[in-house]
């Protein structure tokens, strides 16, 4: 990765850069997309107006899906030292009573479901990961002043910090430039939603003065506040800014001491990192694509922080968009594949916004009615155990489920009956948001009442596939994705997934760079007679694959590079499913040039690890 502070490059007053994909913004989403494209051999240039990666903490929560994406680009092991797994969220009354604790203990996707992390260090891991790719360039201190599109690509005009001009020509452009996105505004894409009236002041400190693990949401009616333990001895406090207060006033030593005294006995012995006031927003772009320009992360959606889903939703965008962009720029798939990005991601981003708003309604209601609703909701926990389990086990979290796009599901229109219309009208109230969120679970009673019976609601198609530990033929026990890599995969349980495969289907799968996998009970792995050439055999160490396949009528699953289930079938139907999938992908004819999707490298170079360690030392020391 060419360095952005190269003195020769800095001396140029006018420069033209050519790339397959230009990414505006070197935040976590832009850097993640760049890593994914870098693994696929795609030429990428990242333009960032700041002179370096932001070095102050913002997001503090990382979920299992996001960690799985880090794994897909070979960076999970480098990130793990900067995370705290099993980071529970506890809701506490003003008297100190814990009335609810979100502590999911499952790991179906291979990682802890709730993790604390230090975002600047995670961003540094992503940036250092780009050193693996000479075809990926990051240009700091480069502000985009405009861009134009034509049928062949995007031309971007930018200014560097030395007063020079840069022209970037790319086939596609991704706007990952934050909530105040210049790209989105220039495209004139509506950013629909609302801004909450309350502000919050965030205070990050070193040498944790409390030390207790987890995150505590104190529902104090006088001033709600948050206390969160973070890795490397850092703690975050968040206090609601009350009407009439300002950041300047609250930042005065005596006022800050009064705030901190609520949680720390001696405010004079607190080692501050920074203080910052922010406002909660809940907004969603009307589309994530305009011709050859795509929006991702905060440029496409912003949400309140209460479930830590802003960062994670952006990483999901990167995972969904990365492999599709790679296929299109490599001329393997047609441009229509990129239309599935909005179709798949926008609905789930909206659900995560609703989830974040509901969490805010519970923790910090902004009206007397909201407080009464919250208190009534909490009281049901003690009399309705099922309600408490639903909350504690995070069953309320909307998991991505793609009903359109690159999935082999029959098209079905949602039913919008009386209940649906009632929820739409009450959607901006606390009860309306909660019920609307619960109705997204289509298999639930409320989901059926609102949207009607969905024959495919229990189907795994369109959902993320599990990631258990498996044994390889060489005897290693690894996570499933470490075997599959970032490529298409067909997994058959107990039978050869290539049996009866037509020559055309086999050729199509080879062009996709896909692999064939035979999963079997672990004790059968040493028997090789049932494993044909070109098929990867894995042992089901934990029994989770057997359990998963026992719940569905089919025994073969087609997986996308982002590990979502594209389709399910019997061994006799694999050829037909591959043909259907090719149509969903807008796969180009065989005579077109094609490049296989690569298996990710497992780790960054040693010098990159050293760079991350150095940043960690700075973050915890100064």
Swiss-Prot record:
Q: Which cofactor does it need?
A: FAD
The lineage's top-level taxon is: Bacteria
EC nos: 1.14.13.127
Positions bound to FAD: 20-49, 288-298
Known catalysed reaction(s)? 3-(3-hydroxyphenyl)propanoate + NADH + O2 + H(+) = 3-(2,3-dihydroxyphenyl)propanoate + NAD(+) + H2O; (2E)-3-(3-hydroxyphenyl)prop-2-enoate + NADH + O2 + H(+) = (2E)-3-(2,3-dihydroxyphenyl)prop-2-enoate + NAD(+) + H2O
Which pathway does it operate in? Answer: Aromatic compound metabolism; 3-phenylpropanoate degradation
Which keywords are on file for this protein? Aromatic hydrocarbons catabolism, FAD, Flavoprotein, NAD, Oxidoreductase
- An example of a Pfam family matching this protein is FAD_binding_3
- Do the record's keywords include Flavoprotein? yes
For this protein, the record's NCBIfam families field holds: PRK06183.1-3, PRK06183.1-4
Entry protein name: 3-(3-hydroxy-phenyl)propionate/3-hydroxycinnamic acid hydroxylase
Source organism (scientific name)? Paraburkholderia xenovorans (strain LB400)
């Amino acid at each position: 990765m060419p360095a952005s502070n190269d003195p020769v490059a800095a001396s140029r007053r006018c420069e033209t850069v050519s790339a397959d994909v230009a990414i505006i913004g070197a935040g976590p989403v832009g850097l993640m997309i760049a890593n994914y494209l870098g693994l696929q051999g795609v030429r990428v240039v990242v333009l960032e107006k700041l002179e370096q990666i932001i070095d102050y903490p913002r997001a503090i929560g990382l979920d299992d899906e996001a960690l799985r994406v880090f794994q897909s680009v070979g960076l999970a092991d480098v990130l793990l030292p900067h995370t705290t797994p099993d980071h529970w969220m506890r809701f506490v009354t003003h008297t100190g009573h814990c009335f609810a604790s979100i502590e999911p203990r499952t790991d179906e996707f291979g990682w802890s479901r709730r993790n604390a992390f230090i975002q600047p260090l995670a961003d540094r891991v992503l940036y250092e990961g780009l050193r693996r790719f000479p075809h990926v360039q990051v240009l700091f201190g480069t502000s985009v002043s405009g861009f134009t599109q034509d049928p062949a690509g995007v031309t971007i005009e930018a200014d560097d910090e030395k007063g020079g001009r840069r022209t970037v020509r790319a086939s596609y452009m991704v706007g990952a430039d934050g909530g105040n996105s210049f790209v989105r505004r220039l495209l004139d894409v509506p950013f629909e939603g609302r801004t909450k009236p309350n502000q919050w002041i965030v205070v990050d400190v070193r040498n944790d003065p409390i030390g207790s693990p987890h995150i505590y949401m104190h529902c104090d009616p006088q001033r709600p506040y948050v206390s969160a333990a973070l890795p490397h001895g850092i703690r975050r406090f968040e206090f609601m800014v009350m009407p009439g207060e300002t950041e300047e006033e609250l930042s005065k030593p005596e006022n800050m001491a009064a705030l901190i005294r609520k949680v720390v006995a001696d405010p004079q012995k607190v080692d501050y990192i920074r203080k910052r006031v922010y406002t909660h927003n809940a907004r969603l772009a009307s589309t994530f694509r305009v011709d050859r320009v795509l929006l991702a992360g905060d440029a496409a959606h912003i949400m309140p922080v209460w479930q830590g889903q802003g960062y994670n939703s952006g990483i999901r965008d990167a995972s969904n968009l990365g492999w599709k962009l790679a296929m299109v720029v490599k001329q393997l798939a047609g441009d229509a594949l990129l239309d599935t990005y909005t179709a798949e991601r926008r609905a789930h981003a909206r659900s995560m916004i609703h989830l974040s708003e509901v969490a805010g309604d519970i923790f910090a209601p902004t009206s007397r009615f909201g407080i009464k609703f919250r208190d009534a909701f909490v009281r049901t926990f003690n009399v309705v155990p099922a309600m408490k389990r639903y909350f504690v086990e995070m069953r309320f979290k909307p998991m991505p489920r793609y009903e359109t796009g690159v999935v082999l599901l029959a098209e079905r229109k949602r039913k919008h009956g009386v209940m649906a219309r009632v929820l739409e009208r009450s959607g901006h109230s606390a009860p309306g948001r909660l019920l609307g969120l619960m109705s997204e679970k289509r298999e639930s009673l409320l989901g059926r009442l609102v949207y009607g019976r969905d024959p495919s609601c229990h189907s795994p198609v369109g959902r993320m596939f599990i990631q258990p530990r498996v044994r390889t033929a060489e005897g290693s026990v690894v996570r499933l994705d470490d075997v599959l890599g970032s490529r298409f995969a067909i997994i058959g349980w107990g039978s050869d997934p290539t049996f009866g495969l037509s020559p055309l289907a086999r050729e199509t799968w080879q062009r996709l760079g896909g692999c064939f996998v035979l999963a079997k009970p672990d004790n059968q792995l040493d028997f090789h007679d049932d494993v044909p050439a070109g098929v990867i055999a894995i042992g089901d160490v934990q029994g989770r694959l057997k359990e998963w396949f026992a719940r569905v009528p089919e025994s073969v699953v087609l997986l996308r590079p982002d590990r979502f289930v594209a389709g399910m079938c019997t061994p006799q139907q694999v050829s037909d499913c591959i043909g259907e999938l090719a149509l969903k992908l807008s796969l180009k004819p065989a005579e077109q040039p094609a490049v296989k999707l690569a298996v990710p490298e497992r780790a960054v170079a040693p010098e990159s690890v050293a760079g991350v360690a150095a940043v960690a030392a700075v973050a915890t020391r100064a």
